[in-house]
Swiss-Prot record:
Pathway membership: One-carbon metabolism; tetrahydrofolate interconversion
Positions of transmembrane segments: none
Keyword check for Acetylation: no
Keywords: ATP-binding, Ligase, Nucleotide-binding, One-carbon metabolism
Protein name from the UniProt record: Formate--tetrahydrofolate ligase
GO MF entries: ATP binding; formate-tetrahydrofolate ligase activity
EC number: 6.3.4.3
Highest classification ranks of the organism: Bacteria, Pseudomonadati, Pseudomonadota, Alphaproteobacteria, Acetobacterales
Catalysis: reaction(s): (6S)-5,6,7,8-tetrahydrofolate + formate + ATP = (6R)-10-formyltetrahydrofolate + ADP + phosphate
Protein family (similarity comment): Belongs to the formate--tetrahydrofolate ligase family.
Organism expressing this protein natively: Acidiphilium cryptum (strain JF-5)
Swiss-Prot/TrEMBL GO biological process terms: tetrahydrofolate interconversion
Amino acid sequence: MASDLDIARASRLRPIGEIAAAAGIPAEALIPYGRYKGKVDGGFIRSLEDRPDGALVLVVGISPTPAGEGKTTTSIGLGDALRAAGAKAMIALREPSLGPCFGQKGGATGGGRAQVAPMEEINLHFTGDFHAITSANNLLAAMLDNHVYWGNELGIDPRRIAFRRAIDMNDRALRQTVLGLGDGANGAAREQKFDITVASEVMAIFCLARDLDDLQRRLARIVVAERRDGSPVTPADLKAVGAMAALLRDALQPNLVQTLEGTPALVHGGPFANIAHGCNSVIATRTALKLADIVVTEAGFGADLGGEKFLDIKCRQAGLAPSCAVVVATIRALKMHAGVAKADLGAENPGAVARGAANLRRHVAAMRAFGLPVIVAINGFVTDTGAEREALRAALDEDGGARICFCTHWADGSAGATDLAQAVIETIAAKSARFAPLYPDDMKLPHKLRTIAQRIYGADDIELSPLAAKRLARFEAQGYDHLPVCVAKTQYSFTADPARRGAPTGFTVPIRDARLSAGAGFVVALAGDVMTMPGLPRIPAAEAIGLDPDGAIHGLF
Protein backbone atom coordinates (compact mmCIF):
# COMPACT_ATOMS: atom_id res chain seq x y z
CA MET A 1 0.00 0.00 0.00
CA ALA A 2 1.35 3.44 -0.93
CA SER A 3 2.22 5.73 1.97
CA ASP A 4 0.66 9.16 2.41
CA LEU A 5 3.95 10.70 1.29
CA ASP A 6 4.04 8.50 -1.83
CA ILE A 7 0.44 9.43 -2.71
CA ALA A 8 1.18 13.13 -2.21
CA ARG A 9 4.28 12.99 -4.39
CA ALA A 10 2.46 11.14 -7.15
CA SER A 11 -0.20 13.86 -7.33
CA ARG A 12 0.13 16.71 -9.80
CA LEU A 13 -0.11 19.99 -7.92
CA ARG A 14 -1.21 23.22 -9.55
CA PRO A 15 0.92 26.38 -9.29
CA ILE A 16 -0.08 28.35 -6.22
CA GLY A 17 -1.12 31.31 -8.40
CA GLU A 18 -3.86 29.17 -9.97
CA ILE A 19 -5.09 28.11 -6.53
CA ALA A 20 -5.16 31.75 -5.42
CA ALA A 21 -7.16 32.73 -8.50
CA ALA A 22 -9.65 29.93 -7.84
CA ALA A 23 -10.09 31.27 -4.30
CA GLY A 24 -10.63 34.83 -5.50
CA ILE A 25 -7.21 36.10 -4.41
CA PRO A 26 -5.64 38.38 -7.06
CA ALA A 27 -2.03 37.87 -8.13
CA GLU A 28 -0.88 41.08 -6.44
CA ALA A 29 -2.26 39.83 -3.09
CA LEU A 30 -0.35 36.53 -3.22
CA ILE A 31 3.15 36.35 -1.74
CA PRO A 32 4.64 33.13 -3.19
CA TYR A 33 6.86 30.86 -1.10
CA GLY A 34 8.08 28.61 -3.88
CA ARG A 35 5.81 26.96 -6.46
CA TYR A 36 3.09 25.47 -4.28
CA LYS A 37 2.64 27.62 -1.21
CA GLY A 38 2.21 31.30 -0.46
CA LYS A 39 0.90 33.91 1.94
CA VAL A 40 -2.10 36.19 1.53
CA ASP A 41 -1.31 39.89 1.80
CA GLY A 42 -2.71 41.63 4.86
CA GLY A 43 -3.86 44.66 2.88
CA PHE A 44 -6.02 42.47 0.67
CA ILE A 45 -7.49 40.80 3.75
CA ARG A 46 -8.47 44.20 5.15
CA SER A 47 -10.23 45.01 1.88
CA LEU A 48 -12.56 42.04 2.41
CA GLU A 49 -14.04 43.40 5.64
CA ASP A 50 -17.40 44.44 4.19
CA ARG A 51 -18.08 41.16 2.39
CA PRO A 52 -20.68 38.82 3.92
CA ASP A 53 -19.44 35.69 5.67
CA GLY A 54 -19.92 32.21 4.31
CA ALA A 55 -21.14 29.29 6.41
CA LEU A 56 -18.71 27.78 8.91
CA VAL A 57 -18.54 24.01 9.44
CA LEU A 58 -16.67 22.79 12.53
CA VAL A 59 -15.09 19.32 12.41
CA VAL A 60 -14.18 17.59 15.68
CA GLY A 61 -13.36 14.04 16.69
CA ILE A 62 -14.14 11.57 19.43
CA SER A 63 -11.65 10.87 22.22
CA PRO A 64 -8.59 9.77 20.20
CA THR A 65 -7.20 6.24 20.26
CA PRO A 66 -4.10 4.58 18.80
CA ALA A 67 -6.42 3.24 16.09
CA GLY A 68 -6.73 6.76 14.67
CA GLU A 69 -9.85 8.73 13.73
CA GLY A 70 -8.83 10.79 10.68
CA LYS A 71 -10.29 14.16 11.65
CA THR A 72 -7.96 16.23 9.47
CA THR A 73 -8.36 13.70 6.65
CA THR A 74 -12.14 14.07 6.94
CA SER A 75 -11.95 17.87 6.99
CA ILE A 76 -9.97 17.76 3.74
CA GLY A 77 -12.17 15.09 2.15
CA LEU A 78 -15.27 17.11 3.03
CA GLY A 79 -13.80 20.28 1.56
CA ASP A 80 -12.96 18.44 -1.66
CA ALA A 81 -16.43 16.86 -1.81
CA LEU A 82 -18.16 20.21 -1.30
CA ARG A 83 -16.10 21.67 -4.13
CA ALA A 84 -16.92 18.68 -6.34
CA ALA A 85 -20.62 19.22 -5.58
CA GLY A 86 -20.38 22.75 -6.96
CA ALA A 87 -20.05 24.66 -3.70
CA LYS A 88 -17.52 27.46 -3.39
CA ALA A 89 -15.65 25.88 -0.49
CA MET A 90 -12.37 26.44 1.32
CA ILE A 91 -10.59 24.66 4.14
CA ALA A 92 -8.96 26.32 7.19
CA LEU A 93 -6.57 24.12 9.19
CA ARG A 94 -3.79 24.35 11.76
CA GLU A 95 -0.11 24.11 10.92
CA PRO A 96 1.71 20.99 12.17
CA SER A 97 4.19 21.17 15.04
CA LEU A 98 7.62 19.57 14.72
CA GLY A 99 7.15 17.90 18.11
CA PRO A 100 4.50 15.37 17.01
CA CYS A 101 6.08 15.02 13.55
CA PHE A 102 9.22 13.62 15.14
CA GLY A 103 7.43 12.07 18.11
CA GLN A 104 4.48 9.67 17.97
CA LYS A 105 1.48 11.28 16.24
CA GLY A 106 3.20 12.22 12.99
CA GLY A 107 2.25 15.10 10.72
CA ALA A 108 -1.04 16.91 10.28
CA THR A 109 -1.73 17.16 6.55
CA GLY A 110 -4.40 14.46 6.25
CA GLY A 111 -3.95 11.08 4.64
CA GLY A 112 -4.49 8.98 1.54
CA ARG A 113 -6.32 10.87 -1.20
CA ALA A 114 -7.43 13.56 1.26
CA GLN A 115 -4.31 15.60 1.94
CA VAL A 116 -3.07 19.17 1.77
CA ALA A 117 0.19 19.60 -0.08
CA PRO A 118 3.16 19.93 -0.39
CA MET A 119 3.04 17.43 2.48
CA GLU A 120 6.67 17.35 3.61
CA GLU A 121 7.10 21.13 3.40
CA ILE A 122 3.95 21.82 5.44
CA ASN A 123 4.92 19.25 8.07
CA LEU A 124 8.44 20.59 8.50
CA HIS A 125 9.42 24.28 8.27
CA PHE A 126 6.52 25.42 6.02
CA THR A 127 6.77 29.24 5.75
CA GLY A 128 8.60 29.75 9.03
CA ASP A 129 5.63 30.85 11.15
CA PHE A 130 6.52 28.67 14.13
CA HIS A 131 10.12 29.89 14.00
CA ALA A 132 8.83 33.47 14.19
CA ILE A 133 6.52 32.66 17.10
CA THR A 134 9.29 30.84 18.99
CA SER A 135 11.69 33.73 18.35
CA ALA A 136 9.20 36.34 19.57
CA ASN A 137 8.51 34.28 22.69
CA ASN A 138 12.18 33.83 23.53
CA LEU A 139 13.07 37.45 22.75
CA LEU A 140 10.61 38.46 25.45
CA ALA A 141 12.12 35.94 27.87
CA ALA A 142 15.62 37.26 27.13
CA MET A 143 14.57 40.89 27.59
CA LEU A 144 12.91 40.02 30.89
CA ASP A 145 16.05 38.40 32.31
CA ASN A 146 18.19 41.15 30.81
CA HIS A 147 16.17 43.81 32.64
CA VAL A 148 16.71 42.04 35.95
CA TYR A 149 20.44 41.69 35.21
CA TRP A 150 20.91 45.40 34.46
CA GLY A 151 19.57 46.72 37.75
CA ASN A 152 15.90 45.71 37.75
CA GLU A 153 14.46 49.22 37.52
CA LEU A 154 10.91 47.81 37.48
CA GLY A 155 11.40 46.04 40.80
CA ILE A 156 10.61 42.58 39.40
CA ASP A 157 10.49 39.83 42.00
CA PRO A 158 12.67 37.03 40.52
CA ARG A 159 10.60 34.49 42.46
CA ARG A 160 7.48 35.61 40.59
CA ILE A 161 8.68 35.39 37.00
CA ALA A 162 5.92 33.43 35.25
CA PHE A 163 6.88 33.67 31.58
CA ARG A 164 8.45 30.58 30.03
CA ARG A 165 10.82 30.01 27.17
CA ALA A 166 9.56 27.85 24.29
CA ILE A 167 10.80 25.45 21.64
CA ASP A 168 8.86 23.62 18.92
CA MET A 169 10.05 20.18 19.95
CA ASN A 170 9.08 17.40 22.37
CA ASP A 171 11.90 17.62 24.94
CA ARG A 172 11.15 16.44 28.47
CA ALA A 173 14.61 17.53 29.69
CA LEU A 174 13.41 21.14 29.43
CA ARG A 175 10.38 20.73 31.68
CA GLN A 176 12.33 21.97 34.69
CA THR A 177 15.71 23.68 34.29
CA VAL A 178 17.97 26.16 36.07
CA LEU A 179 19.20 29.30 34.31
CA GLY A 180 22.16 31.51 35.11
CA LEU A 181 24.54 28.91 36.53
CA GLY A 182 28.18 29.94 36.80
CA ASP A 183 29.49 33.35 37.77
CA GLY A 184 27.46 36.54 38.00
CA ALA A 185 28.07 37.40 34.35
CA ASN A 186 25.40 34.81 33.46
CA GLY A 187 22.70 36.48 35.53
CA ALA A 188 21.09 35.30 38.73
CA ALA A 189 20.39 31.59 38.94
CA ARG A 190 16.71 30.72 38.91
CA GLU A 191 14.40 27.90 37.95
CA GLN A 192 12.89 28.03 34.44
CA LYS A 193 10.36 25.78 32.73
CA PHE A 194 9.95 25.49 28.97
CA ASP A 195 6.72 25.03 27.02
CA ILE A 196 6.42 23.55 23.57
CA THR A 197 5.78 26.49 21.21
CA VAL A 198 2.25 25.33 20.42
CA ALA A 199 1.34 25.60 24.13
CA SER A 200 2.79 29.10 24.55
CA GLU A 201 0.74 32.23 25.12
CA VAL A 202 2.43 33.88 22.14
CA MET A 203 1.04 31.11 19.90
CA ALA A 204 -2.43 31.63 21.38
CA ILE A 205 -2.20 35.38 20.82
CA PHE A 206 -1.02 34.82 17.25
CA CYS A 207 -4.07 32.66 16.55
CA LEU A 208 -6.64 34.89 18.27
CA ALA A 209 -5.45 38.29 16.99
CA ARG A 210 -7.68 39.91 14.36
CA ASP A 211 -4.89 42.03 12.83
CA LEU A 212 -1.50 43.58 13.59
CA ASP A 213 -2.97 46.23 15.89
CA ASP A 214 -4.84 43.61 17.89
CA LEU A 215 -1.68 41.47 17.97
CA GLN A 216 0.29 44.30 19.55
CA ARG A 217 -2.43 45.07 22.08
CA ARG A 218 -2.52 41.43 23.13
CA LEU A 219 1.27 41.12 23.33
CA ALA A 220 1.33 44.20 25.57
CA ARG A 221 -1.09 42.53 28.02
CA ILE A 222 0.95 39.38 28.73
CA VAL A 223 1.74 39.15 32.44
CA VAL A 224 5.37 37.99 32.50
CA ALA A 225 6.13 38.56 36.19
CA GLU A 226 5.12 40.49 39.28
CA ARG A 227 6.85 43.30 41.11
CA ARG A 228 7.69 42.98 44.76
CA ASP A 229 4.45 44.86 45.54
CA GLY A 230 2.46 42.26 43.60
CA SER A 231 1.65 44.45 40.58
CA PRO A 232 1.99 42.87 37.11
CA VAL A 233 4.89 43.35 34.70
CA THR A 234 4.12 43.23 30.99
CA PRO A 235 6.03 43.35 27.67
CA ALA A 236 4.90 46.97 27.41
CA ASP A 237 6.83 47.71 30.61
CA LEU A 238 9.89 45.99 29.12
CA LYS A 239 9.53 47.86 25.79
CA ALA A 240 9.44 44.48 24.01
CA VAL A 241 6.15 44.73 22.10
CA GLY A 242 7.50 46.45 18.99
CA ALA A 243 10.32 43.98 18.43
CA MET A 244 8.02 41.01 19.04
CA ALA A 245 5.50 42.37 16.55
CA ALA A 246 8.27 42.93 14.01
CA LEU A 247 9.20 39.25 14.25
CA LEU A 248 5.56 38.22 13.84
CA ARG A 249 4.48 40.70 11.14
CA ASP A 250 4.97 38.54 8.07
CA ALA A 251 4.01 35.33 9.85
CA LEU A 252 0.58 36.79 10.69
CA GLN A 253 -0.38 36.66 7.01
CA PRO A 254 -2.17 33.31 6.45
CA ASN A 255 -0.63 30.54 4.35
CA LEU A 256 -2.34 29.33 1.18
CA VAL A 257 -1.86 25.75 -0.06
CA GLN A 258 -4.04 23.19 -1.86
CA THR A 259 -5.51 19.76 -1.43
CA LEU A 260 -4.52 16.96 -3.80
CA GLU A 261 -7.73 17.79 -5.72
CA GLY A 262 -6.95 21.51 -5.90
CA THR A 263 -9.25 22.87 -3.17
CA PRO A 264 -7.79 26.07 -1.65
CA ALA A 265 -6.72 25.67 1.98
CA LEU A 266 -5.53 28.26 4.49
CA VAL A 267 -3.17 26.54 6.95
CA HIS A 268 -2.16 28.94 9.70
CA GLY A 269 -1.27 28.76 13.39
CA GLY A 270 -1.29 25.60 15.43
CA PRO A 271 -1.95 25.53 19.19
CA PHE A 272 -2.43 22.07 20.68
CA ALA A 273 -5.96 21.34 21.87
CA ASN A 274 -5.07 19.36 24.98
CA ILE A 275 -2.68 21.94 26.48
CA ALA A 276 -3.82 25.06 24.58
CA HIS A 277 -6.97 26.21 22.73
CA GLY A 278 -6.51 24.03 19.64
CA CYS A 279 -7.74 26.19 16.74
CA ASN A 280 -6.19 27.71 13.64
CA SER A 281 -5.85 31.49 13.39
CA VAL A 282 -8.81 33.84 13.53
CA ILE A 283 -7.30 35.72 10.58
CA ALA A 284 -7.26 32.61 8.39
CA THR A 285 -10.79 31.57 9.37
CA ARG A 286 -12.24 35.04 8.80
CA THR A 287 -10.39 35.40 5.48
CA ALA A 288 -11.77 32.07 4.28
CA LEU A 289 -15.29 33.10 5.32
CA LYS A 290 -15.01 36.24 3.18
CA LEU A 291 -13.76 34.29 0.15
CA ALA A 292 -15.95 31.15 0.23
CA ASP A 293 -19.59 30.19 0.66
CA ILE A 294 -18.68 27.24 2.91
CA VAL A 295 -15.57 26.98 5.09
CA VAL A 296 -14.54 23.70 6.68
CA THR A 297 -12.37 24.08 9.76
CA GLU A 298 -11.30 21.71 12.50
CA ALA A 299 -10.56 21.88 16.20
CA GLY A 300 -8.00 19.62 17.80
CA PHE A 301 -8.89 16.26 19.34
CA GLY A 302 -12.47 15.75 20.54
CA ALA A 303 -15.53 17.89 21.12
CA ASP A 304 -14.52 18.05 24.79
CA LEU A 305 -11.20 19.77 24.06
CA GLY A 306 -10.71 21.60 20.76
CA GLY A 307 -14.44 21.69 20.08
CA GLU A 308 -15.37 23.29 23.40
CA LYS A 309 -12.47 25.75 23.16
CA PHE A 310 -13.29 26.69 19.57
CA LEU A 311 -16.83 27.56 20.62
CA ASP A 312 -16.20 29.06 24.06
CA ILE A 313 -12.94 30.90 23.31
CA LYS A 314 -12.39 31.47 19.59
CA CYS A 315 -16.01 32.07 18.60
CA ARG A 316 -16.63 34.22 21.68
CA GLN A 317 -13.63 36.45 20.92
CA ALA A 318 -13.92 36.55 17.12
CA GLY A 319 -17.70 36.75 16.77
CA LEU A 320 -17.96 33.49 14.82
CA ALA A 321 -21.03 31.23 14.70
CA PRO A 322 -20.80 27.78 13.06
CA SER A 323 -23.70 26.47 11.02
CA CYS A 324 -23.11 22.86 12.05
CA ALA A 325 -20.62 20.44 13.57
CA VAL A 326 -19.25 17.22 12.12
CA VAL A 327 -18.07 14.61 14.63
CA VAL A 328 -15.58 12.15 13.15
CA ALA A 329 -15.16 8.57 14.37
CA THR A 330 -14.07 5.17 13.13
CA ILE A 331 -15.58 1.81 13.90
CA ARG A 332 -12.11 0.63 14.94
CA ALA A 333 -11.79 3.45 17.48
CA LEU A 334 -15.24 2.74 18.92
CA LYS A 335 -14.17 -0.87 19.51
CA MET A 336 -11.15 0.39 21.44
CA HIS A 337 -13.42 2.55 23.59
CA ALA A 338 -15.27 -0.68 24.43
CA GLY A 339 -12.02 -2.31 25.59
CA VAL A 340 -11.02 -4.26 22.46
CA ALA A 341 -7.25 -4.62 22.07
CA LYS A 342 -5.63 -2.98 19.05
CA ALA A 343 -4.53 -6.38 17.73
CA ASP A 344 -8.17 -7.54 17.63
CA LEU A 345 -9.72 -4.55 15.88
CA GLY A 346 -9.93 -6.31 12.51
CA ALA A 347 -12.34 -8.95 13.82
CA GLU A 348 -16.06 -8.27 13.46
CA ASN A 349 -17.55 -7.21 16.80
CA PRO A 350 -20.92 -5.40 16.58
CA GLY A 351 -21.39 -5.59 20.35
CA ALA A 352 -18.17 -3.68 20.98
CA VAL A 353 -19.18 -1.06 18.43
CA ALA A 354 -22.48 -0.55 20.25
CA ARG A 355 -20.75 -0.21 23.62
CA GLY A 356 -18.03 2.08 22.31
CA ALA A 357 -20.61 4.33 20.69
CA ALA A 358 -21.24 5.79 24.15
CA ASN A 359 -18.10 7.88 23.65
CA LEU A 360 -19.36 9.13 20.29
CA ARG A 361 -22.78 9.97 21.74
CA ARG A 362 -21.19 12.11 24.46
CA HIS A 363 -19.20 14.08 21.88
CA VAL A 364 -22.37 14.58 19.84
CA ALA A 365 -24.15 15.80 22.97
CA ALA A 366 -21.29 18.19 23.69
CA MET A 367 -21.74 19.91 20.33
CA ARG A 368 -25.51 20.01 20.75
CA ALA A 369 -25.00 21.77 24.09
CA PHE A 370 -23.87 24.78 22.05
CA GLY A 371 -26.98 24.72 19.88
CA LEU A 372 -25.34 23.16 16.82
CA PRO A 373 -26.88 20.54 14.53
CA VAL A 374 -24.53 17.55 14.35
CA ILE A 375 -23.56 15.18 11.55
CA VAL A 376 -21.55 12.04 12.33
CA ALA A 377 -18.88 11.09 9.79
CA ILE A 378 -17.55 7.53 10.00
CA ASN A 379 -14.12 7.34 8.42
CA GLY A 380 -14.24 3.90 6.82
CA PHE A 381 -11.74 1.04 6.95
CA VAL A 382 -11.79 -2.09 4.78
CA THR A 383 -12.32 -4.19 7.93
CA ASP A 384 -15.66 -2.49 8.73
CA THR A 385 -18.64 -4.79 8.26
CA GLY A 386 -22.31 -4.24 7.53
CA ALA A 387 -23.28 -5.67 10.92
CA GLU A 388 -20.98 -3.20 12.68
CA ARG A 389 -22.40 -0.27 10.73
CA GLU A 390 -25.95 -1.30 11.64
CA ALA A 391 -24.95 -1.68 15.30
CA LEU A 392 -23.63 1.87 15.21
CA ARG A 393 -26.80 3.21 13.62
CA ALA A 394 -28.89 1.56 16.32
CA ALA A 395 -26.64 2.88 19.09
CA LEU A 396 -26.91 6.45 17.82
CA ASP A 397 -30.68 6.17 17.56
CA GLU A 398 -30.84 5.62 21.34
CA ASP A 399 -30.42 9.36 22.00
CA GLY A 400 -32.62 10.69 19.25
CA GLY A 401 -30.04 10.00 16.60
CA ALA A 402 -27.74 12.09 14.51
CA ARG A 403 -27.40 12.02 10.77
CA ILE A 404 -24.64 9.53 10.02
CA CYS A 405 -22.51 9.31 6.89
CA PHE A 406 -20.11 6.49 6.09
CA CYS A 407 -17.11 7.88 4.21
CA THR A 408 -14.19 6.51 2.20
CA HIS A 409 -12.33 9.72 1.35
CA TRP A 410 -8.95 8.30 2.43
CA ALA A 411 -9.14 5.81 -0.44
CA ASP A 412 -11.46 7.61 -2.85
CA GLY A 413 -10.91 11.34 -2.26
CA SER A 414 -13.91 13.59 -2.80
CA ALA A 415 -15.98 10.74 -4.24
CA GLY A 416 -15.80 9.01 -0.87
CA ALA A 417 -17.35 11.96 0.99
CA THR A 418 -20.23 12.79 -1.37
CA ASP A 419 -22.93 11.85 1.15
CA LEU A 420 -21.22 13.85 3.89
CA ALA A 421 -21.00 16.92 1.66
CA GLN A 422 -24.69 16.64 0.78
CA ALA A 423 -25.60 16.32 4.46
CA VAL A 424 -23.60 19.45 5.26
CA ILE A 425 -25.17 21.42 2.40
CA GLU A 426 -28.68 20.42 3.52
CA THR A 427 -27.94 21.19 7.17
CA ILE A 428 -26.62 24.65 6.32
CA ALA A 429 -29.67 25.34 4.15
CA ALA A 430 -32.00 24.36 7.02
CA LYS A 431 -30.52 27.17 9.18
CA SER A 432 -31.21 25.20 12.34
CA ALA A 433 -28.13 26.30 14.29
CA ARG A 434 -28.83 28.24 17.49
CA PHE A 435 -25.26 28.77 18.59
CA ALA A 436 -24.51 30.15 22.03
CA PRO A 437 -21.43 29.77 24.26
CA LEU A 438 -21.73 27.38 27.17
CA TYR A 439 -21.46 30.00 29.92
CA PRO A 440 -21.75 33.80 30.27
CA ASP A 441 -18.75 36.08 30.70
CA ASP A 442 -19.81 37.17 34.17
CA MET A 443 -19.82 33.65 35.65
CA LYS A 444 -17.06 33.11 38.24
CA LEU A 445 -14.02 31.14 37.07
CA PRO A 446 -14.62 28.01 39.21
CA HIS A 447 -18.24 27.90 38.04
CA LYS A 448 -17.11 28.11 34.41
CA LEU A 449 -14.86 25.11 35.01
CA ARG A 450 -17.65 23.24 36.76
CA THR A 451 -20.04 23.97 33.86
CA ILE A 452 -17.59 22.52 31.33
CA ALA A 453 -16.87 19.48 33.50
CA GLN A 454 -20.52 18.66 34.07
CA ARG A 455 -22.09 19.55 30.71
CA ILE A 456 -19.28 18.51 28.35
CA TYR A 457 -17.22 15.86 30.18
CA GLY A 458 -20.13 14.27 32.08
CA ALA A 459 -18.38 14.75 35.44
CA ASP A 460 -20.06 15.07 38.81
CA ASP A 461 -17.93 18.05 39.82
CA ILE A 462 -14.47 19.59 39.84
CA GLU A 463 -11.94 19.43 42.67
CA LEU A 464 -9.70 22.48 43.05
CA SER A 465 -6.31 22.02 44.67
CA PRO A 466 -5.40 24.70 47.24
CA LEU A 467 -2.95 26.18 44.71
CA ALA A 468 -5.55 26.29 41.92
CA ALA A 469 -8.18 27.81 44.22
CA LYS A 470 -5.70 30.46 45.40
CA ARG A 471 -4.68 31.40 41.88
CA LEU A 472 -8.23 31.54 40.53
CA ALA A 473 -9.22 33.79 43.43
CA ARG A 474 -6.21 36.00 42.71
CA PHE A 475 -7.11 36.27 39.03
CA GLU A 476 -10.65 37.25 39.93
CA ALA A 477 -9.39 39.88 42.38
CA GLN A 478 -7.18 41.31 39.62
CA GLY A 479 -10.22 41.75 37.36
CA TYR A 480 -9.83 38.71 35.11
CA ASP A 481 -12.99 36.90 36.20
CA HIS A 482 -14.73 37.79 32.91
CA LEU A 483 -12.31 35.69 30.85
CA PRO A 484 -13.19 32.26 29.44
CA VAL A 485 -11.33 29.21 30.73
CA CYS A 486 -9.09 26.86 28.76
CA VAL A 487 -8.80 23.42 30.34
CA ALA A 488 -5.49 21.61 29.79
CA LYS A 489 -6.44 17.95 30.05
CA THR A 490 -5.59 14.56 28.60
CA GLN A 491 -7.15 14.07 25.18
CA TYR A 492 -7.70 10.35 25.66
CA SER A 493 -10.58 10.51 28.15
CA PHE A 494 -13.41 12.72 29.34
CA THR A 495 -11.75 12.36 32.75
CA ALA A 496 -8.24 13.45 33.77
CA ASP A 497 -7.14 9.79 33.63
CA PRO A 498 -6.04 8.78 30.10
CA ALA A 499 -6.77 5.11 30.82
CA ARG A 500 -10.52 5.66 31.35
CA ARG A 501 -11.90 5.30 27.84
CA GLY A 502 -15.50 5.22 26.69
CA ALA A 503 -17.99 7.47 28.49
CA PRO A 504 -17.15 7.27 32.21
CA THR A 505 -19.54 8.42 34.92
CA GLY A 506 -19.20 9.12 38.62
CA PHE A 507 -15.95 11.10 38.47
CA THR A 508 -14.58 14.50 39.43
CA VAL A 509 -12.05 16.53 37.45
CA PRO A 510 -9.03 17.53 39.57
CA ILE A 511 -7.73 21.04 38.80
CA ARG A 512 -4.19 21.17 40.18
CA ASP A 513 -3.06 24.60 38.95
CA ALA A 514 -4.11 27.66 36.96
CA ARG A 515 -2.28 30.15 34.77
CA LEU A 516 -3.29 33.55 33.47
CA SER A 517 -3.02 34.21 29.73
CA ALA A 518 -4.06 37.85 29.82
CA GLY A 519 -2.85 38.57 26.30
CA ALA A 520 -4.65 35.60 24.78
CA GLY A 521 -7.69 36.45 26.85
CA PHE A 522 -8.29 33.28 28.86
CA VAL A 523 -7.36 31.48 32.06
CA VAL A 524 -5.68 28.08 31.72
CA ALA A 525 -6.73 25.38 34.21
CA LEU A 526 -4.45 22.35 34.41
CA ALA A 527 -6.33 19.12 35.08
CA GLY A 528 -4.55 16.02 36.36
CA ASP A 529 -0.99 15.35 35.24
CA VAL A 530 -1.10 17.05 31.83
CA MET A 531 2.20 18.72 30.89
CA THR A 532 2.82 21.68 28.59
CA MET A 533 6.12 20.21 27.36
CA PRO A 534 5.66 16.71 25.88
CA GLY A 535 8.39 14.08 25.66
CA LEU A 536 9.40 11.77 22.85
CA PRO A 537 8.19 8.13 22.93
CA ARG A 538 10.56 5.18 23.35
CA ILE A 539 10.84 4.89 19.56
CA PRO A 540 10.29 8.38 18.09
CA ALA A 541 9.09 8.77 14.52
CA ALA A 542 12.29 10.72 13.86
CA GLU A 543 14.22 7.42 13.75
CA ALA A 544 12.47 6.48 10.48
CA ILE A 545 12.88 9.85 8.74
CA GLY A 546 15.74 10.52 6.36
CA LEU A 547 16.85 11.39 2.84
CA ASP A 548 17.16 9.14 -0.19
CA PRO A 549 20.17 9.39 -2.56
CA ASP A 550 18.40 12.14 -4.52
CA GLY A 551 17.82 14.22 -1.39
CA ALA A 552 14.08 13.47 -1.16
CA ILE A 553 12.64 13.04 2.33
CA HIS A 554 11.28 9.64 3.35
CA GLY A 555 9.59 8.37 6.51
CA LEU A 556 7.21 11.27 7.17
CA PHE A 557 3.61 10.31 7.93
